[in-house]
């Protein structure tokens, strides 16, 4: 009796072990990416576009103002969409149709903040691993005959688990997870669940999850429509499939041609401008697709587009190519991304490719099963070896190969601890010193309008009117981080606007600390506090790489830091921080220019250091004081050479005569100098 009970217990444990492993992988993903996403927000690296405005729209929805936000209201800036021409620029439905945000707003009853959105996004993405596992188990389980050896039985149980890390480590999902919050990032799990229900003959689940998926974004209806066609033509569920296809495609068309124009006042989606190279209207684009297909084919031959398409396949370890029929279901999103003139959409970064991942995973599962079944049948027909053994051994080989390829691609392009891009930053002193300002703003009555810089917007968005600086309108307060991204304007324009506001618009400085500015309308105070410049001071700093290079006995470069940033894009993004010391008073406003070369000595990029010009010019540097200057993250990490030059005022970046010379070593170590010894190379060890 005890022996039988023990055998039963062992049998249950063996069968539950794969599912338990899937659960552990999901929990690990949630813990790691939840922390990464939260830490990114805590360090002021989330932005108005898109966490800030989504958070405000969700908060307003909960408070009886559905889908209202003020990010683009009275916009004093230009974007790649015509926000100035919107009839109702304060209604989100004019930009995207994402009804799921109304349901998400109820979660704010539990925790009222953008952290809710970030954790929700992480958890839902992770839960997509469950239908991946179930789809694989269903597909490979159909090959079980009951005559497998113990080894083959164990393999049957564990093979589906291999597709879970393939999903969780896909760079497009990780990119979406660490790109603020987007409702469309919730769609992969919903699409996978819908497909799982379809393939296991539970149409109610297919319809239910498909219905929720289409509420994530206007284009997701096209993906569900393609799944409906799969149900009709592959699964032979004609009525179910065609009804779902027509309803879902109809919803997408209604969203783009009716709902969005109703609120925007435009003829169609405002994002149609990103496809202007193919026509100025949906009808013109379709006409050109039929009459001038070469126009589209030429676009697909662009190196950046080919690289993007190849990266998608590598996400599945290349296994998705084994079952191209499934990949057809992803065609709408692939086309939307590939044909866009906005290169971020076909970079593999951001949230744009998240909804493609489900079909890559399904194609990988079906492709492995199909090829191994064909191989096993061919071998068995020729009586070479047991066909069933060939099936399982071929499956193992294919999955192992696919995982190796996917892991290699993930190491290069992902952002998990297994990637070269992984970074878990501590909460910085700069972010900590922003908290008193956030708390002060949050104590203001919610009807008081404010204007905020992009990276501070998500932290103070819970009020009816929060403008994105440089829009001021009727704002009573302006809150800026001058070291953060100045977009949608340049650093120089930002500084000019602040100066004009202080000089002519009756604003004064209410607080200034560590690079943060709080301006108040009607205040008679125009000086920055001494602590405002603390963000540029680095007393006692220890650069990663010591340099010791002097410029004409005026400036000393003590060293630099080279920090990789966790951004999914073809090129490695890095943040370069340099440490300088003025050796004597600097009367002129010197400029720092960074140059990036390839191995063939071709100049690839020129990047000016703008903070030192506009917010902390060199004539403010005290002799002997260490000054820290950080460039914004740049996609230059794979370039082998970077150099810096000190330019005299009012000289061009390429003007050799305008560069400060000579450059000499203060440590006795040789320096690597470029371009007539006017540029110092920052040599990494």
Where are these regions (language model features)?
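Transmembrane-helix signature of polytopic, membrane-embedded enzymes
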Residues: 127-169, 188-189, 204-208
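C-terminal luminal/periplasmic domains and tails of membrane-associated envelope-modifying transferases
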Residues: 402, 425-460, 464-685
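Hydrophobic/aromatic-rich transmembrane helices and adjacent perimembrane loops
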Residues: 327-383
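Transmembrane-helix motifs of polytopic, lipid-linked glycan transferases
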Residues: 106, 114-141, 193
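Signature aromatic-anchored transmembrane alpha helix within multi-pass, membrane-resident enzymes
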Residues: 18-30, 245-249, 372-414
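Start-transfer (signal-anchor) and selected internal transmembrane alpha helices
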Residues: 1-35, 137, 151, 157, ...
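Membrane-interface alpha helices of multi-pass inner-membrane proteins
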Residues: 163, 192-197, 204-218, 223-232, ...
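Membrane-lumen/periplasm interface segments of specific transmembrane helices
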Residues: 32-36, 43-46, 233-331, 365, ...
């Amino acid at each position: 009796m005890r022996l039988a009970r023990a055998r039963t217990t062992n049998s249950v444990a063996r069968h539950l072990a794969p599912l338990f492993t899937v659960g552990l992988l999901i929990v690990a993903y949630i813990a790691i990416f939840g922390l990464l996403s939260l830490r990114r927000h805590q360090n002021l690296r989330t932005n108005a576009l898109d966490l800030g405005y989504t958070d405000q729209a969700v908060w307003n929805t909960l408070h009886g103002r559905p889908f209202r936000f003020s990010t683009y209201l009275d916009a004093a800036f230009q974007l790649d969409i015509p926000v100035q021409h919107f009839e109702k620029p304060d209604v989100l439905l004019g930009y995207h149709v994402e009804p799921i945000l109304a349901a998400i707003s109820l979660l704010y009853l539990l925790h009222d903040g953008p952290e809710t959105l970030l954790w929700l996004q992480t958890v839902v993405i992770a839960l997509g691993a469950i239908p991946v596992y179930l789809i694989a188990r269903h597909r490979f389980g159909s090959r079980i005959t009951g005559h497998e050896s113990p080894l083959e039985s164990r393999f049957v149980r564990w093979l589906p688990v291999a597709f879970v890390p393939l999903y969780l480590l896909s760079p497009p999902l990780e990119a979406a997870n660490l790109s603020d919050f987007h409702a469309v990032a919730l769609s992969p799990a919903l699409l996978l669940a819908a497909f799982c229900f379809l393939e296991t003959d539970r149409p109610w689940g297919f319809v239910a999850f498909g219905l929720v998926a289409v509420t994530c974004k206007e284009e997701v209806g096209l993906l569900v429509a393609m799944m409906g066609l799969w149900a009709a033509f592959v699964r032979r569920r004609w009525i179910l499939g065609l009804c779902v296809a027509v309803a879902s495609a109809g919803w997408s068309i209604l969203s783009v041609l009716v709902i969005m124009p109703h609120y925007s006042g435009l003829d169609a989606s405002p994002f149609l401008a990103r496809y202007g190279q193919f026509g100025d209207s949906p009808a013109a684009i379709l006409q050109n697709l039929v009459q001038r297909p070469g126009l589209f084919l030429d676009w697909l031959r662009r190196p950046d587009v080919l690289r993007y398409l190849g990266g998608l396949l590598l996400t599945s370890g290349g296994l998705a190519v084994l079952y191209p029929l499934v990949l057809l279901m992803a065609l709408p999103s692939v086309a939307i991304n590939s044909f866009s003139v906005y290169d971020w959409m076909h970079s593999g970064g951001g949230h744009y490719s998240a909804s493609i991942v489900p079909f890559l995973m399904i194609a990988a599962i079906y492709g492995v099963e199909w090829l191994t079944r064909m191989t096993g049948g061919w071998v068995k027909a020729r009586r070479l070896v047991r066909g069933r053994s060939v099936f399982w051994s071929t499956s193992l080989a294919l999955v192992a190969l696919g995982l190796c390829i996917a892991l290699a691609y993930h190491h290069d392009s992902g952002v998990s601890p297994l990637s070269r891009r992984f970074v878990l930053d501590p909460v910085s002193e700069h972010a900590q010193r922003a908290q008193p300002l956030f708390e002060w703003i949050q104590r203001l009555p919610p009807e008081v309008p404010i204007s905020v810089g992009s990276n501070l917007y998500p932290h103070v968005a819970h009020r009816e009117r929060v403008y994105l600086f440089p829009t001021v309108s009727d704002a009573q307060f302006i809150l800026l981080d001058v070291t953060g991204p100045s977009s949608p304007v340049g650093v120089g324009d930002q500084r000019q606007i602040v100066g004009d506001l202080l000089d002519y618009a009756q604003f004064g400085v209410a607080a200034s600390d560590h690079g943060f500015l709080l301006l108040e309308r009607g205040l008679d105070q125009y000086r920055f506090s001494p602590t405002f410049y603390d963000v540029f001071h680095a007393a006692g700093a220890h650069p990663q790489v010591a340099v010791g290079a002097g410029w004409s006995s005026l400036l000393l470069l003590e060293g630099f830091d080279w920090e990789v940033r966790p951004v999914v894009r073809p090129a490695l993004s890095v943040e370069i921080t340099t440490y300088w010391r003025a050796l004597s008073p600097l009367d002129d406003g010197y400029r720092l220019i960074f140059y990036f070369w390839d191995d063939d000595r071709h100049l690839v990029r020129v990047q000016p250091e703008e903070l030192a010009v506009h917010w902390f010019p060199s004539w403010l540097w005290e002799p002997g004081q260490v000054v820290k200057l950080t460039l914004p993250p740049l996609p230059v990490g794979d370039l082998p050479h970077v150099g810096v030059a000190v330019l005299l005022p009012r000289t061009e970046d390429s003007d050799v005569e305008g560069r400060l010379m000579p450059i000499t070593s203060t440590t006795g170590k040789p320096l690597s100098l470029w371009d007539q010894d006017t540029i110092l190379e920052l040599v990494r060890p």
